[in-house]
Curated annotation (Swiss-Prot):
Induction: Expressed in the early phase of the viral replicative cycle. Pfam families: Pox_C4_C10. It is found in: Host cytoplasm; Host nucleus. The lineage of its organism: Viruses, Varidnaviria, Bamfordvirae, Nucleocytoviricota, Pokkesviricetes. Belongs to the poxviridae OPG031 protein family. This is Protein C4. GO terms for cellular component: host cell cytoplasm; host cell nucleus. The gene is OPG031. Its main location: host cell. InterPro entries: Poxvirus_C4/C10. Keywords: Early protein, Host cytoplasm, Host nucleus. Plays a role in the inhibition of host NF-kappa-B activation. Mechanistically, blocks the subunit p65/RELA translocation into the host nucleus.
């Protein structure tokens, strides 16, 4: 999320009454100060908050909600009662949305954001409350978010979604959008392949038009020789190599030998591929360069721009 998120659709209405009821139990413990409560009741409330936040944020791997809930009475809140660092977020929930209490947040010394809605903001920001005087009108708790390294999610079938990531970790296939620099031996402009962790390449589409036949090559160099250059039987005369010993999709320490590759077979799988193609078509600003060298004299160098989308599919 950004440094500030305002919840203005009553996202926390379901737990507002729980907080009011909790306040009835603990209010007598203090007269003129903020009070922080931690109990089995606050653990239940924290779990409810966590479930609500999971629905609000995409690509979140983990959400931690502190079971310490602070009821705020003064305009200025001494945050040392909540946390001793500035990592993560504060969540402010108003006990009564009809009151005139406001949260004032200062992203910069010259800028102030004012809200009367439930709000979540980075602990690194300066803030204060306005019109918090005679009674407890809001609560605060500490939130920690851990995000997946994910670009988006695509529906795979009726019961499953697949994360599309720019990270190799935890994934077993890479969808590569490959754009070739102009060369007199190359007629294609863009080609897309699925590369598994052994380096095998499934030709998916060219010019963003999907292939129906499943063409699988042992390496990207083989794919180039057979499909791009159309020189399948000239290995004795002309070969391709990457001088750095790199794979087009995977770091060398991620490569595994002998892996089968995923092949689309069902309508759901072909629909998934089509969705992946569309995502890649409009989200390809980040790319790496990959070069293949032909053993001519002098050497022929082919340069490719590669945008990579990592996924994890279960297959045998």
């Amino acid at each position: 999320m950004d440094t500030i998120k305002i919840f203005n659709h009553g996202e926390f209405d379901t737990i507002r009454n729980k907080l009011v009821n909790l306040l009835k139990v603990v209010k007598w413990n203090t007269i003129n100060s903020n009070v922080t409560v931690s109990s089995t009741d606050t653990i239940d409330i924290s779990n409810c908050i966590r479930e609500i936040l999971y629905k609000q944020f995409k690509n979140v791997r983990n959400i931690e909600v502190s079971s310490n809930i602070s009821f705020i009475k003064y305009n200025r809140f001494n945050d040392t009662t909540l946390t001793d660092d500035n990592v993560g977020y504060y969540l402010v929930i108003y006990l009564n949305r009809m009151k005139s209490v406001k949260t004032l947040i200062y992203p910069t010394p010259e800028t102030v954001i004012t809200s009367s809605e439930d709000i979540m903001f980075s602990k690194s920001l300066n803030f204060r409350f306005e019109n918090v005087k005679r009674d407890y009108k809001l609560v605060m708790c500490s939130i920690s978010l851990t995000y997946k390294p994910s670009i988006c999610r695509i529906q795979y079938d009726n019961n499953k979604y697949i994360d599309i990531s720019d990270s190799q970790e935890g994934n077993n296939l890479c969808y590569c959008v490959i754009t070739m620099d102009p060369h007199h031996l190359i007629d294609l402009e863009t080609i897309c392949v699925l590369v598994n962790k052994s380096g095998k390449c499934l030709l998916v589409n060219e010019f963003y038009t999907r292939f129906r036949k499943n063409h699988i090559y042992d390496s990207f160099a083989d794919l180039c020789m057979d499909h791009i250059f159309e020189l399948p039987d000239t290995e004795e005369l002309f070969t391709l190599r990457n001088d750095d010993g790199r794979n087009i999709a995977w770091d060398n320490d991620k490569l595994e030998s002998g892996n089968n590759t995923w092949i689309p077979k069902t309508d759901d799988e072909y629909k998934f591929l089509s969705k992946l193609m569309n995502i890649a078509k409009f989200n390809n600003t980040k790319f790496d360069y990959y070069m293949l060298v032909g053993d001519t004299d002098p050497c022929t160098v082919f340069t490719f721009k590669v945008t990579k989308y990592y996924i994890n599919l279960n297959y045998e």
